[in-house]
């Protein structure tokens, strides 16, 4: 007993959706920048410290609750500094500053975000290891026609991850 439903396409709904002008302008800039290019990007990796013992101590459901609470704090702070959450990788968050929207002080924004993230996560009795690096990276679509992601690639993003791995918690 299947029924076919019609879902309206976003393009068909644009006449009926109100988008504030500042957001519309940012969306247009971001769309133009999504073609893929080498650009200055600041990558921030934030990884929960002591996650393996934590995951052994609690049920899977409780671990997911803890991780989600941590991720909420990270996401809220990154967005507050106008960064972009790229993805969650296990117990790690990858965020970009300067992609797709660029600010002249993106590296500073990422550092301020990292400090605020540490403060917020301490309230949850957790600590993070954070790594940040800025450099020229490819930012744009990666993948195949059947599955694409928008991400950044290059040695400078790998350095951010290595710095995160070497960092002390908190």
Kindly give the residue locations of the regions a language model identified:
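Alpha-helix/helix-capping structural signal
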Residues: 22, 49, 136-137
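Generic structural marker for isolated residues within well-ordered, non-membrane alpha-helices
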Residues: 12, 51, 160
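Leucine-rich amphipathic alpha-helices with coiled-coil/heptad-repeat character
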Residues: 5, 55-58, 121
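Catalytic beta-strand-to-alpha-helix segment of the class III nucleotidyl cyclase homology domain
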Residues: 96-170
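Regulatory cytosolic signal-relay segments
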Residues: 1-39
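Amphipathic alpha-helical regulatory segments at dimerization interfaces
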Residues: 26, 30-33, 73-80, 116-123, ...
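Glycine-centered helix-coil hinge/cap
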Residues: 20-21, 59, 154
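Catalytic NTP-binding/metal-coordinating core of nucleotidyl cyclase/transferase enzymes
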Residues: 30-113, 150
């Amino acid at each position: 007993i299947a029924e076919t439903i019609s879902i309206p396409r976003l393009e068909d709904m644009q006449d009926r959706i109100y988008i504030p002008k500042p957001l519309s302008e940012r969306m247009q800039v971001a769309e133009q920048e999504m073609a893929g290019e080498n650009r200055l990007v600041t990558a921030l990796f934030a990884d929960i410290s002591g996650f393996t013992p934590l995951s052994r101590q609690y049920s899977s459901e409780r671990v997911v609750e803890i991780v989600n609470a941590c991720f909420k704090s990270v996401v809220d702070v990154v967005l507050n500094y106008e960064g972009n959450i790229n993805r969650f990788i296990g117990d790690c968050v990858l965020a970009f500053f300067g992609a797709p929207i660029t600010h002249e002080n993106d590296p500073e924004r990422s550092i301020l975000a990292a400090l605020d993230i540490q403060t917020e996560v301490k309230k949850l009795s957790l600590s993070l290891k954070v790594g940040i690096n800025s450099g020229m990276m490819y930012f744009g679509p990666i993948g195949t026609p059947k599955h694409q992601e928008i991400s950044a690639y290059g040695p400078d993003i790998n350095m951010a991850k290595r710095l995160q791995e070497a960092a002390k918690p908190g």
